[in-house]
Amino acid sequence: MTGAGPRPWRSWAVVGAFALIVGAPAGALGGAWTLPQGTGQLIETLYGWTGFGPPWGGNPPVNQSRVDAQTYVQYGLTDSLTVFGQTALEHYALGPPTPNTYNGLDYSDLGLRAKLWSTGEWVFSGEATVFVPGGHDSKAPAQEGNTGVAGEARLNIGRNFTLGSIPGFVDAELAYRLRTAGPPDEWHGDLTVGFKFTPRVMLMLQDFTTVSMKTTDPTFPAWRSSVAEASLVYALDDKWSVQVGVFTTVWTVKTNSERGVALALWRNF
């Protein structure tokens, strides 16, 4: 038992997937929304965090740090069907008592988002995603718990609104993720609220919560985590945007804490 445990992962492209481009309505792209046919979005993200793992097995908390360079792309196959995928290079380091470092590919994923129903303000969609691990040495402390294929089904609900004269959107997502190679399956609940203060400036407030299923495996016990993030997105023009965000865990049970920053560059095409 490493004292590190299966670390949570998620796509930081989700942070950038709500592209409020110049002249577009709030929440036009990503999240619960599908892309118009023949259009796409590319997001390059660099993020990093430091934190502590839980004190398992009588060991003290474990210092941890991680840096990822992530590429995410989504493309509208039809107005109601969007394909998306991502890959990332990862540096993940554990401190004593089991120091170990992993440098290589993080999880890569490929998925489809289908619009189920929409009105003028509301949109409902579903997603199916498969995750392929980059690490394959389950005995290495920095890879343990993150060497198995995973699959996920997700339901998304989005709504555009105005707060006074400020356009905004809210996106709520619920997912169930099947894990292999050790860790228990997981429920994911993500919430995003965005406000477009000017044609170029958007504020996003987000929460990413994961609650695993119960398990009797002492190596991979049940765990919970909730990460809050605030970020600003600035549209350079109708195709390019930049994003700066900060995030921190606000709740953890038998998994690591996180405190970090994220930088992203968006390109609509």
Name what the model sees in each region.
Residues 27-179, 188-269:
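Transmembrane beta-barrel domains of Gram-negative outer membranes and organellar outer membranes
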Residues 1-35:
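Cleavable N-terminal export/targeting peptides
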